[in-house]
Every structure is written in C-alpha cells, then in structure tokens.
Amino acid sequence: MQRHHLLPCQLLTRRCFGPLFDLIGRDRLGFDDFRSNVLLLPASGESAVRLKLPLHRGPHRDYNAMVLERVGQIEGDWSRLRLAAPEVALDQALMRFALLQRALRRRLLETERKRVRLNRRDPFGAGLDFAELDAMAEALWAGTAPGLRAQ
C-alpha cells in the first residue's frame, strides 16, 4: 500500500496558490493528515484487483490536473471575496477544501461506478472488449448525420 494525497503536494509548489496557502496554512488543510488528506491505495496490480481500488504507482497527471483545476476555482472565488469580506472568504475556502477532500476520497473508494484510473498501469479495464459499444456509438453517429430530418 502507498500513501495517496487527495490534495497533491504539487499544489504547494504552485506560486499562484501561494497567498491562499500562506493564509490557510499547510496544517489546516491537513496535507499530511491521514484523516483528511491521505488515503492508502494498492501499489501492485494484484492488490488493486483484489481490493477493487485504484492502483497507486507512478505519476497520476490527469488526477493532479483535475484537482489543480478545482483548487483554482476555490482560489479564484477566495481572491474575489477576500477584498470585501476576508473572514467569510477564508471560512468559505476552508469549507470548500474539506468538501473537495471528502468528495475525492469517496470517489476513489467507490466500487459501484467506473473506477478512477490514477495511471496507465492500473489493471482495471485491461482486456475489455469495446466492440459492441463502438458499434452502438457508430450507429448513433450515423443516425445524427447532417441532413437527416427528425421523424
């Protein structure tokens, strides 16, 4: 098992988030706190399949990019609101970070929906045949070709 940071440590290296993180503080966001920001995920393909959890090995760029985008939204709203109501802006940012962390944890642990793939080595989905799905998509695409009238 390996530690996975729900809010990636990469966030702390982004200067654009510096003012917000300087105000909030690394400890308040719980960057290294298992209860709020860390999740243990399998480090081997066999464990990932057995536990039905995402494989945590190597970089997970798409996940980090998605989280960076969400944090950018939080930071943008905080930047606008802090000029008029700094305390409200801080409280709102802290609440949104907590909600984001809970949502990320819940999504990574979910087994009913399509599993999150943190990296390309995740065995989930290996060997799946999408021929039938591709055929259905092709039929839908052909049915929506320009010039066809709705009936």
Regions found by a protein language model. Name each.
Residues 33-44, 49-50:
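Elongated alpha-helical scaffolds
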